Design a protein with these regions (language model features):
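Ser/Thr-rich, Pro/Gly/Ala-heavy low-complexity intrinsically disordered linkers and tails
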Residues: 1-41
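Interdomain/boundary linker segments immediately adjacent to catalytic/signaling cores
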Residues: 36-117
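Structural alpha-beta junctions
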Residues: 114-123, 219-240
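Catalytic cores of nucleic-acid endonucleases
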Residues: 154-221
Length: 247
């Protein structure tokens, strides 16, 4: 298990608002992994499977699921709170994405990877090169243990925020789309510049019930749809509405 690091660098597959369904996961990890120490300080408190990704996971042909909790004592205010982010998060906050509506969810997906896994920011969505340029796009590219990794970010909740639990049909639709988009963006990324070793699907959900629905939806998918993708499923708590209402 990798030790928890503080990252002072910067960083998100086609950014469209994902309000009505969750992304997916395939199987919970061992309980011993869930008791990892909290991540180092920043905006919000991280706990759960911090540091759970080993270098072997980044090149393995098999998928993996990591579950994390992100608790916010108060709402994030931009730009006043930018100095509390990693340098990568600050870069993302100052860089427009490719027309998506979920900028803060992408920033805090990166913050989790930076603070828990020691990820370093490489490129934002608009900086990654694709061939053809019309390819599906991922949200950011990071460096993790010497490996380039693509990161696709989505939110798994029933919209509008606070309108009730995520339903299974919507969850299956979202998981199918997001895992499929990862295959498409990996096929389209420019091979000599930004080619990554694999991708992470970073999913944020606002309670344990929606997280469980998302995992159950992922379990219904054919393994070929999931491929070798790493699922990082983050359940947010506290004053977390800004993650789901940032348009």
């Amino acid at each position: 298990m990798r030790p928890v690091l503080v990252l002072c660098l910067a960083a998100a597959c086609g950014s469209s608002p994902d309000h009505a369904s969750p992304d997916a996961a395939w199987a919970p990890q061992d309980a011993k992994d869930i008791d990892a120490p909290p991540a180092a300080t920043g905006f919000g408190d991280l706990s759960g499977m911090c540091g759970a990704l080993a270098e072997a996971d980044l090149t393995s042909p098999s998928p993996k699921t990591v579950q994390v909790n992100f608790n916010f004592a108060r709402a994030y205010m931009d730009p006043a709170d930018r100095p509390l982010l990693t340098a990568g998060g600050q870069h993302m906050a100052a860089t427009p994405n490719a027309g998506g509506s979920s900028g803060l969810s992408e920033i805090f997906a990166y913050e989790e990877l930076a603070r828990c896994e020691g990820a370093m920011f490489l490129k934002s969505e608009t900086e990654i090169i694709y061939d053809p340029v019309t390819s599906k796009k991922t949200d950011l590219e990071i460096m993790l243990d010497g490996h380039k990794i693509g990161v696709s970010v989505t939110r798994a909740f029933k919209g509008p925020f606070g309108s009730g639990p995520l339903d299974m049909a919507s969850a299956v639709t979202l998981t199918t789309k997001k895992f499929s988009d990862i295959h498409d963006s990996t096929a389209g990324v420019q091979t000599t510049v930004d080619k990554w070793d694999k991708q992470i699907l970073a999913v944020e959900t606002d309670d344990a019930e929606d997280a469980a629905t998302f995992l159950a939806a992922t379990a219904t998918l054919d393994p070929s749809v999931i491929g070798d993708t790493i699922l990082v499923l983050t359940t947010t708590d506290g004053d977390d509405g800004f993650i789901y209402t940032n348009m």
